[in-house]
From Swiss-Prot:
Protein family according to the UniProt entry: Belongs to the class-II aminoacyl-tRNA synthetase family.
Catalytic reactions of this protein: tRNA(Asn) + L-asparagine + ATP = L-asparaginyl-tRNA(Asn) + AMP + diphosphate + H(+)
The entry's keywords: Aminoacyl-tRNA synthetase, ATP-binding, Cytoplasm, Ligase, Nucleotide-binding, Protein biosynthesis
InterPro entries: Aa-tRNA-synt_II, aa-tRNA-synth_II, aa-tRNA-synth_II/BPL/LPL, Asn-tRNA-ligase, Asp/Asn-tRNA-synth_IIb, NA-bd_OB-fold, NA-bd_OB_tRNA
Entry protein name: Asparagine--tRNA ligase
Source domain of life: Bacteria
Quaternary assembly: Homodimer.
Localization, UniProt: Cytoplasm
Protein EC: 6.1.1.22
Gene Ontology terms: biological process: asparaginyl-tRNA aminoacylation
Molecular function GO terms recorded: asparagine-tRNA ligase activity; ATP binding; nucleic acid binding
Main location: cytoplasm
Length: 469
């Protein structure tokens, strides 16, 4: 093979007007079929869901070499791109030279032509990118990340890198992974018998972050508008299709934004991401719609059709209580003060309003200490964006800008002042109204891909009792 000949991506060969030209493509064999005279090889290089058909006239190739080309093998092909005579593809490559980079023993290679369950593929997460399904999902994941950066960049917001190692628990939930270099077999102790973290690497108790919000607020108080986008960690012992121990979060924080502006931003943002997916990932989305979720494309278009409903929590409870009176059955009880379950959120979106909902003004008892208190003293300016199929997709609020009120709320919620002294400084010096929200990246991907298990939209899922690879 000509080592100097530039490689052409299959996506470009399929759509780039190269018919009649000699090209060099490289990729992994999906299938090989044929007869004594000719072999047809389906080659994929990850640039598109579509394979390139390679036509190899066996008289021109060594039989021993061709026998090594099996499903999973990696090869390079030089040949002429021609219009295809067969059904199923518009163009194909008439091979003049083939080089084998790596073979795949059919006796042991786990991804043979037959279909595989998603459960099985989770057990071989290191190989599942080679399947059509996961090639599609990881390309969509890339495009969604680009959409997020593009949206905020166009807004003039700055990408801010919040630390992954922290001494604060933003959510006050306490479900954090500890970071330590101490030997568990010989922990240093204080006179009171407690672990002496002064002897640890950082000289104090530290954990992996559950959110970059608090640090993000500090940046917003100087840069005006920022967003974080990075991994977060929750040591929540939940083995469900909706929970991961390691996931990615997008968290904008914007100075001078009040709750109404925050709702506008969240709606504009999520619609932008969905539209980006439809504009840039249609081949991949169509594959997922055909194989996993027939209603996927309609559901994506559904969220773009009209403005989201703005709904106060109290009114939402009234609607749900009315539904119960009319015979609707919910697993979890409905009452003012309840933290709504996914079934309640989905009823409001899918049955009652038939459009996404932004719920606001939640009881202060079920929300975090940093949310701004309303004038009624009972509710806070929190907001959740509720979507079909998954319920809450975004959670946010206007932040409490008043120092005394924030301290009072922290004390009320059992958050020690000594742990957030630096956070309180932003209210002590030049405080300003500001708002923000958090979007779990994998929740967004669940919606855009139509997949039903969050473990299938992240490359290497981390869940209880599972940290393979």
């Amino acid at each position: 093979m000509d080592k100097k000949m530039k490689r052409t991506r299959i996506a470009d060969a399929l759509h780039g007007g190269l018919v009649g030209q000699e090209i060099n493509i490289k990729g992994w064999v999906r299938t090989k079929r044929g007869n004594k005279a000719v072999n047809f090889i389906a080659l994929n290089d990850g640039s598109t869901i579509h394979n390139m058909q390679i036509v190899a006239d066996l008289a021109s190739f060594d039989a021993a070499q061709m026998s090594q080309i099996t499903t999973g093998a990696c090869i390079g092909v030089i040949g002429t791109l021609v219009e295809s005579q067969g059904a199923g593809q518009s163009v194909e490559v008439q091979a003049s030279a083939i080089e084998i980079y790596g073979t795949a023993d059919p006796a042991t290679y786990p991804l043979q032509k037959k279909g595989h369950t998603l459960e099985f593929l989770r057990e071989i997460a290191h190989l599942r990118p080679r399947t059509n399904t996961f090639g599609v999902i990881y390309r969509i994941r890339h495009h969604m990340a680009i959409a997020i950066h593009t949206f905020f960049h166009n807004k003039g917001y700055y990408y801010f890198h919040a630390p992954l190692i922290t001494a604060s628990d933003c959510e006050g939930a306490g479900q954090m992974f500890q970071v330590t270099t101490l030997n568990p077999d010989s922990l240093p102790r204080t006179e009171e018998g407690q672990v002496d973290y002064r002897k640890d690497f950082f000289g104090r108790h530290t954990s992996l972050t559950v959110s970059g919000q608090l640090e993000g607020e500090m940046a917003a108080m100087a840069l005006g508008g920022i967003y974080t986008f990075g991994p977060t960690f929750r040591a929540e012992n939940s083995n469900t299709p909706r929970h991961l121990a390691e996931f990615w979060m997008i968290e904008p924080e914007v100075a001078f934004l009040e709750i109404e502006d925050n709702m506008d931003l969240a709606e504009e943002f999520i619609k932008y991401c969905v539209q980006w997916a439809l504009d840039n990932c249609m081949d991949d989305i169509s594959f997922l719609s055909e194989h996993f979720d027939k209603e996927l494309i309609d559901r994506l278009k559904f969220v773009l059709e009209k403005p989201f409903v703005r709904l106060a929590y109290t009114e939402g409870i009234r609607i749900l209580e009315e539904a119960v009176k009319n015979g609707v059955k919910f697993e979890f009880p409905i009452y003012w003060g309840a933290d709504l379950a996914s079934e309640h959120e989905r009823y409001l979106v899918e049955v009652h309003f038939k459009t996404p909902v932004i719920m606001t003004d939640y009881p202060k008892e079920i929300k975090s200490f940093y949310m701004k208190l309303n004038d009624d003293g009972k509710t806070v300016r929190g907001m959740d964006v509720l979507f079909p199929k998954i319920g809450e997709i975004i959670g946010g609020s206007e932040r409490e800008a008043d120092y005394d009120k924030l301290v009072a709320r922290a004390n009320e919620m059992g958050v020690p002042e000594k742990d957030i002294w630096w956070y309180l400084d932003s209210r002590r010096y030049g405080t300003a109204p500001h708002s923000g929200f958090g979007l779990g990246f994998e929740r967004l991907l669940l919606f855009v891909t139509g997949m039903s298990n969050i473990r299938d939209v992240i490359p290497f899922p981390r869940t209880p009792n599972n940290a393979e690879f």
